[in-house]
Swiss-Prot record:
InterPro entries: G1P_dehydrogenase_arc, G1PDH, Glycerol_DH. The gene is egsA. This is Glycerol-1-phosphate dehydrogenase [NAD(P)+]. It comes from Halobacterium salinarum (strain ATCC 700922 / JCM 11081 / NRC-1) (Halobacterium halobium). Keywords: Cytoplasm, Lipid biosynthesis, Lipid metabolism, Metal-binding, NAD, NADP, Oxidoreductase, Phospholipid biosynthesis, Phospholipid metabolism, Zinc. GO terms for biological process: glycerophospholipid metabolic process; phospholipid biosynthetic process. Its cofactor is Zn(2+). Zn(2+) binds at D172, H252, H268. NAD(+) binds at G98, K99, A100, I101, D102, T120, A121, A122, S123, S129. Its main location: cytoplasm. Binds 1 zinc ion per subunit. Catalyzes the NAD(P)H-dependent reduction of dihydroxyacetonephosphate (DHAP or glycerone phosphate) to glycerol 1-phosphate (G1P). The G1P thus generated is used as the glycerophosphate backbone of phospholipids in the cellular membranes of Archaea.
């Protein structure tokens, strides 16, 4: 008897384009969210976008509350929950980059209220997904949560964000290429459940960005449009799979371990981009697609070497040889690779 079932949670509204920030109230109304909004933001996004959103809610009498978080930590989540206890919000609105959106996402999931994502930078696929990433000490936790009910991505705002944040988002998407390879490998060798649809969507998104990398330029709304659509596709793939597998493989394990060994040296997206070069070499060898991955990253001004990441060669090798210890997730790294193998991969690809 067939007993398989799935529950796919997706955003109800994804609004992308020029000037859509001004439609915040209309988008929220269309999702049927009611009550007092609690806007979660951080210092720079507060000026860039959150004040606009707050003014819109004030204009219609929704009496928005605002909490400004400095960093993405569980303490920040607790702070938002404390504010929520005081104001009794009907829903949360995360305005900013990774910090504010992840904090709002986790807090709204805990409160069991709706959440609206308003990204001010295209720095990672968390703007749409049901995953939140929160560092704690030298460890970064990937936490499951409900995806946003709505996403409002203003390409004008995102195009004006620091270019390095956009290149980090691009690198995060490009790394889906090796994440899907790791997922398929885990399915073959460990019988890990695999979704053909989610895998194909994630791989197509990565390949699209690799093919168009040379056309993505700073301060162009057309470029912001392409990157945001790719981030949305990646987030949807994770929701379909009910797993981060479509967008997180050995390259993410490498990045998380690098966070422990050399904390604060580089952006997450840039680290997984370099990790993807290494992972593709490990998957396919010298004749694989690692050069295409590297060249796409380079055309975006994203790092492709340890030096460009700001980390030492030995730190890259240490992260690569111990990345399998991060979590119980089968990838091309298996139970770990030797330092000799790690050095060969990093040297052949020019990472070190």
């Amino acid at each position: 008897m067939f007993e398989k079932s799935t529950w796919i949670r997706l955003p109800r509204n994804v609004v992308v384009g020029h000037g859509v920030l001004d439609d915040a109230v209309e988008v929220v109304r269309d999702t049927h969210l009611t009550g007092r909004p609690l806007v979660v933001t951080s210092p720079t996004p507060k000026t860039v976008a959150a004040e606009n959103v707050v003014a819109q809610f004030e204009a219609v009498g929704d009496d928005p509350a605002v909490v400004v978080v400095e960093e993405a930590t569980f303490n920040s989540v607790e702070r938002v929950l404390g504010e929520a206890e005081a104001v009794d919000p009907g829903y949360l609105v995360g305005v900013g980059g990774g910090k504010a959106i992840d904090i709002a996402k986790l807090a709204s999931d805990h409160l069991n209220v709706g959440f609206v994502s308003v990204p001010t930078a295209a720095s990672h696929d968390g703007i749409v997904s049901g995953r939140g990433s929160v560092p704690e000490g030298d460890t970064r936790h990937s936490v499951s949560a409900a995806p946003p009910l709505a996403v409002i991505a203003d390409t004008g705002v995102i195009a004006d964000a620091p270019w390095e944040l956009t290149t980090a988002g691009c690198a995060d998407i490009i790394s889906n290429y090796t994440a899907v390879k790791d997922w398929r490998l885990a399915n073959r060798l460990q019988h890990v459940p695999y979704s053909e649809y989610a895998g194909a969507l994630s791989q197509m998104t990565a390949e699209m960005l690799v093919d168009n990398a040379a056309n993505i330029k700073p301060e162009l709304e057309e470029s912001a449009w392409v990157v945001v659509k790719a981030l949305v596709s990646s987030g949807v793939a994770m929701s379909i799979a009910d797993s981060s597998r479509p967008a997180s493989g050995s390259e993410h394990l490498f990045s998380h371990q690098l966070d422990r060994i050399a904390p604060g040296k580089a952006l997450h997206g840039h680290q997984v981009g370099v990790g993807s070069i290494l992972a593709e070499y490990l998957h396919s060898g010298q004749e694989g697609q690692w050069m295409a991955v590297r060249d796409a990253l380079a055309s975006l001004d994203a790092p492709t070497t340890a030096d460009e990441l700001g980390v030492a060669d030995d730190e890259v090798l240490a992260a690569l040889t111990s990345a399998h210890e991060i979590r119980d997730r089968y990838t091309i790294l298996g139970g770990g690779i030797s330092e000799v193998a790690a050095r060969e991969a990093a040297s052949r690809t020019g990472v070190i």
